[in-house]
Amino acid sequence: MLQDVVVRWTGKERANYVRCIMIKQIKFVSIPVADQNRALDFYTEKLGFTIITDQPFDEKQRWIELRIPKAETRVVLFTPEGDEKRIGTFMNMSYACDDIDKTYAELKERGVEFESAPQKEPWGTYTLFKDSEGNRFVVSSD
């Protein structure tokens, strides 16, 4: 009898099951940091992120989870043990904004370090900035 169920489990039923178990979003991204206090100041004061959680994780670190305005994905300022070499490198993620020129000007005024002024490409306009830990990020608009 189980064989009949498995054999007949095709088409619409299978598609519905697959949709139910599929990954639906990125919950958070972890940004490696050397100094959590310095990084927290940067992300809240310069980028305008808000604190969701700031609690002890272990003897060395806290679990600091931040909200990006108008975004579901959260940012975690946390470095897994053994991943310290990632601090100060290019991050394989990018931030999106509505107006790159306005965002660039406002963040530069707040003291954010940029590698260059926004550059226009066929896929959009972008620039690179560094956080307090030397991590490099792309920020772009269409």
Predicted regions and their residues:
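Vicinal oxygen chelate
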Residues: 33-37, 88, 92-136
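A short beta-turn/loop motif at secondary-structure boundaries
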Residues: 56-58, 84, 120-121
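Active-site beta-strand termini and strand-to-loop segments that position acidic
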Residues: 66-70, 129-132, 141-142
